[in-house]
């Protein structure tokens, strides 16, 4: 997202985020889940559970549940839409690009994020980056089958499980 974006463009981004907060996609439980993980941020109260039905390296279905701020829920909703039906490798790559945009190592226009670009402005608010990445953190732990390790608050940089010490 261009930091010098016109007010109309910024309003559009805000509308996308609020739409996903009000009516989150893929919200609910997934009893037949093959992978699960939970991400919590005790400092703000965000708490997101991600459940996946994975077969042959593909996310056949995804659900998330929990509670959190508008950014947390909207990000988890957009994440769910973006990875539903996709291969695990795609989900990992998208998470890396999204995290790169929020942490400033990748420009939004270079990341090919689709609707997720509407959350790029979060990078201007460092305390909210964890909110936008919490669902993704849980997703990466679910994919890595590390549900127990995602139970605690995520590290500051929200590195995926394979990159954490």
Identify the residue ranges that each predicted region occupies:
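Structured beta-strand/loop patches that form or line metal/cofactor-binding pockets in enzymes
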Residues: 23-65
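Active-site phosphate/pyrophosphate-handling residues
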Residues: 48, 77, 130
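Short, thiol/selenol-centered motifs that function as redox-active sites or metal-ligating centers
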Residues: 66-75
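Alpha-helical support elements that line or immediately flank enzyme active sites
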Residues: 75-87
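Glycine-rich phosphate/pyrophosphate-binding beta-alpha loops
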Residues: 42, 70, 128
């Amino acid at each position: 997202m261009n930091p010098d974006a016109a007010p109309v463009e910024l309003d559009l981004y805000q509308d996308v985020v609020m739409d996903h907060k009000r009516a989150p996609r893929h919200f609910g439980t997934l009893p037949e889940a093959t992978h699960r993980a939970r991400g919590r941020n005790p400092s703000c109260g965000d708490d997101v559970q991600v459940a996946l039905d994975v077969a042959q390296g593909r996310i056949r279905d995804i659900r998330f549940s929990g509670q959190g701020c508008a950014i947390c829920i909207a990000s988890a909703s957009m994440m769910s839409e973006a990875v539903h039906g996709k291969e695990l490798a795609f989900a990992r790559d998208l998470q890396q690009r999204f995290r790169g945009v929020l942490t400033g190592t990748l420009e939004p226009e270079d990341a090919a994020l689709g609707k997720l670009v509407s959350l790029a402005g979060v990078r201007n608010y460092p305390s909210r980056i964890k909110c936008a990445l919490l669902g993704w953190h849980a997703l990466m732990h679910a994919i890595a089958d590390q549900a127990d390790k995602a139970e605690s608050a995520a590290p500051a940089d929200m590195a995926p499980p394979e990159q954490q010490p």
